[in-house]
C-alpha cells in the first residue's frame, strides 16, 4: 500500500505504521532492559545471520589476518545486513516511485538492535557466561568470538567499556530511527486530516 503523489494517503496505512513504530519502541525498551537483549523472533533470525556471517567471511580467513575476519564476520554481518535494506529503501526507484524513509528507519532500528546484541556478546568476553550454540558457556569452551577478537587485539580488559560504547550507539540509533519513522508520518497525518 503506497501513498501516491496525487492520491490521498490511506489513513489505515498511516495508523498501521504508527502502531509499528510504537511496537518497535516497546521492543527496544524491552531489549535494553533485558539481560540478553532478546527481541522475540528477531533475535532468532539475527542468530542465523550472525552464523552465516562467519561462513561469508571464511575466504578472508587468510593467515595474514589470523582468521580475524572469520571471527568478526558474524557480528559484522549481523549489524550490516539490515543496512543493505536501509540503502534500498532510501534509493529513489527507477520507476519514479518514492523512497520509503519509514521502511528504511525500521531497518535502521533492526541494525541498532543487532548492535545491542553484539554489545552484550562483547561485554561477556572475560566473564564467559553467555550460553553458546554448542550448549556451553564461553568459560566452559575456548571462549567466544569477542573473547578471541579482544584477546588478539590486546583489548580484553576493555571489553565492558567497548560494549558500553556499542550499547550507547545502539540506544541512540534506536531512538533516532523510531523518531525519524514517526516524523515521516506527520505530514501524512496532517494531509489526511485536511482531506477528511
Predicted features and spans:
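Membrane-interface helix-loop junction between the first two transmembrane segments
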Residues: 31-45
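Metalloprotease/metallohydrolase-associated module, dominated by Zn2+-dependent proteases
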Residues: 6-34, 62-196
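Active-site recognition of the HExxH zinc-binding catalytic motif
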Residues: 42-58, 74
